[in-house]
Amino acid sequence: MKFRILFFLLLINSYPFFGQIPINNLVGIESISNINSEFFEYNGYINKNKNFIFFNRSNDPNNVGGIKDQGDVWYSKKVFDNLWTSPENMLELNDQENNLLLGIENQNIIVFTNGEVNIYNITDAGTKLISNSFIKYYKSNSNILSGSISEDKKLIVLSADSYGSYGVEDLYVSKKLNDSTWSSLINLGSSINTSYQETYPYLSSDNSRVFFSSNGYDGYGGFDIFYSDRQDDSWKQWSQPINLGNKINSEGSENSFIYDSNSNIISFSSSKNSIGNSDLKFYYLNLDKNDLPSSDITNFSSIEDGQKIILNKVFFYQSSHELLNESFDQLDLIFNFLNENQNLTVFLEGHTDNIGNAKKNLELSGKRVQTVKKYLITKGINKKRIDGKGFGGERPLISNKSSSSNKLNRRVEIIFNKTM
């Protein structure tokens, strides 16, 4: 897996694409970038309490269907402050089909699989299927699909190669008829669909506007994100699609645009500057800079015994156990957490890239563990609470194909253990 630092401010000239909400700025949420990997992440949803993120990942060997699996649902849990757990596959609700994450609501996850709409309740006790419904006469000529459920949970918008397609993937809507049945797919028509691909539809909160990704309109890259307004209740007449602009779209490809009006969080997936296929990015949308979340949150979530965290902001110079200056903020965060939780011990795992001599890399990784250990001890943590081991380049997060990926492989992972 890959962990990338993301922290910058995007100034936007009040694009009106959220209806009546004027956009003044977007602020990157750096801590959540660690869910990304060398594969394809999309459909990123953060729960109401902002301590879980659920998303889709495709073509990961750890998917139920392996590297040919078009989509499994994964999750990551916020442990404390800016640290999130390594993503895990939600095996209990995935299979070898394309398991499309349509949305979340409270403790429920809504997943679409081969015409079925399944709602799962997620608790500490486990995952339970609480509702099963289906789209009438559902048909798709391929296993490639995307989409989402409306905020009122009465509509599903999908991208599929289905009835009356104008191209490859078109946009469709299905309306909820009762607790067990959804209407057959309604093609959104030629005013929005092209002979190319329209994908990843997402409805505004009032269901009057659809955001989607397409390579059928002029844009900045391969796929750009657009929006279009519904003109009537037929769902077949739409305004001319408008590009969201180069503050979101790039020379790469962007998709799976999502806006949570409750948390004011925007997410989308982009191939720009991604080490993997496409990475999820998260931003706070704020009407006033004074409303930005504080960076010194002190509410800690419970941590599980044996929980592993990748220190995604602790890096080393190549061929050295010297820490980069950017590393100290996160190490101080670890110190504060250990200081607040005296019942925890930690085991440090040191890793290098796999460039050069394997024996020297193994030795170097051990020295990196000692560097982190020494720093925490110097700050005041009892040395008996810290242990560790170096693994050299045996366990890369991602393939060592570039200098940026090499940097991510030169890392330390930390495992928390409870002593009582």
Task: Describe the residue ranges of each PLM region.
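Short, conserved micro-motifs composed of acidic
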Residues: 20-310, 326, 370
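Solvent-exposed, polar/charged alpha-helical surfaces in well-ordered, non-transmembrane soluble domains
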Residues: 88, 186, 329-336, 346, ...
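Sec-dependent N-terminal signal peptides
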Residues: 4-14
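Periplasmic peptidoglycan-binding/tethering modules of Gram-negative envelope proteins
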Residues: 285-345, 419-420
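Periplasmic OmpA-like peptidoglycan-binding domain that tethers envelope proteins to the cell wall
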Residues: 322, 349-420
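Sec/Tat signal peptide C-region and signal peptidase I cleavage site
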Residues: 15-19
